């Protein structure tokens, strides 16, 4: 299934894409795509519904983040060896974990706000993993059983705040609008191998990132298992799993960063695309 949330910010309704790619309304069946709705049992109930029996959503509504009430938004850094190289950092021996504030979450096509005074706002196309069941101390072999599905994430990052101003990465990762998620939550039964997905990103039509999740340092299963040892993962938690090379700070001979008025387009094979315009934060 390709599940989504649509409507004005803060008033999103749950929906599903039908076979023709049209949005059907699910709000008579579930209040949101969150919590227990993301469990295997909850998704099975949605799967049993014939989309043709659901109300058709008219027009072109805003698409929100594909999961609601996110408890934890967990980032993984330097998870592609070639990205670590372009960043001038060693390939990690254990996952590099940081937090993205949930207030950074926005829809896949919402605008990206360039923070006041920022000259180093950067892009990162990433595979997002949505947890579907409470998960603590799980084995790698069973880790994917706790995944509800997958989505596209743009891990927007302000490099000066992230790297140059001391402290943790978190403060450069969590500005408002720095977490576009979606358009769809694609359930795990439709993604048989999350380590075989092409991902890409363009700025103003120029392709900067081309990668495949097979080159991850730590697989999705390894990340879920690892994170479950240091925290309890809950339904609706989102893990964004790192980016391939091609970010702005790695461009040679001189880095390239986002400015107001640009168009960011990105996508992952089978998971849909995002399209954002950049603007100065007010």
From Swiss-Prot:
InterPro entries in UniProt: FAH, Fumarylacetoacetase-like_C, Fumarylacetoacetase_C_sf
Molecular-function GO terms, alphabetical: hydrolase activity; metal ion binding; ureidoglycolate lyase activity
Co-factor requirement: Mg(2+)
Signal sequence residues: none
Keywords: Hydrolase, Magnesium, Metal-binding
Presence of keyword Magnesium: yes
Residues where Mg(2+) binds: 124, 126, 155
Coiled coil regions in record: none
Broad class of enzyme this protein falls into: hydrolase
EC number(s) on file: 3.-.-.-
GO terms under biological process: urate catabolic process
Protein family: Belongs to the FAH family.
UniProt name for this protein: Putative hydrolase Bcen2424_5521
Organism ancestry: Bacteria, Pseudomonadati, Pseudomonadota, Betaproteobacteria, Burkholderiales
